[in-house]
Each structure stands twice: as C-alpha cells, then as structure tokens.
Amino acid sequence: EEYRLPMITPMQMYRTLGVEHDYLAVMAANSHGLTGVENNLYIANPNLKVFGVTMLELVKAIETGKPQEEIIKQFDFHSLFHYFESTEIEAVVLGCTHFPYVKTELEQLSRIPIIDVGVYMIDRLKSHIQEENS
C-alpha cells in the first residue's frame, strides 16, 4: 500500500515560522544549531527580528535528570521571559530536542507561546493529511 505523505523537515518548519512572525526568540543548544535555525528563518523572512540564545549548560542540566522546577530557577528563566515580554517577542522557539523537557514550566512563566518544532511539524502534517482527505 502506498501513502501520499509530504516530506517535511524541522528546517522547513523554521521557514514557515519565519513567514508567520515578525520577532522570535530562539533557544538553541549551541551557536551551530542557532545558526542553522536563523538561516532558515531568514530565508523565509529577511526582515525577521531574532533574539538568539545558546544554552549548552541547559542541555547538560536536562541530561542529569534534574527536576524541571530546579532548572527553571537555576537558569533564571523568569528574568529571561520578563525580558522577552518587555521587548514584545511574539513566540519562543525551542531549537533543541532537549528543551521540550522544560516546556511546561516555561509556559507557566509567560503568555508568550512556546513552540516545540517537533510538535509543530506533526501538527502541520496532520493538517495536510486532513486537507487531502476532505
């Protein structure tokens, strides 16, 4: 049996996000990851404003299994998200596969949407399939 599914990648999703927004914060593990995300965002929207943050130490804290609440305090995300709000960032993109570990805790700090690109990609794929079946 053959399925007609589109081929999609996280990098394509960054391009979609670039079109949908004017100002994003991107949290990545390191500068290489951030550069890849930024390049794809800017391909889609050269006028996009991006506030990039690299946090390899966050990856290490997550890998130790430290509780989410402790991580939020250790990295003072309350202050970071206060800054995001004050500069009118529209959404925060989790540009590392480790970071969804603290997503629920981050969502409690602010009303700024937190985008897990993996979930965003699945939602886009589901939407595409529903459109084809209509």
PLM-predicted stretches and their roles:
Residues 1-134:
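Non-catalytic structural scaffold of enzyme domains
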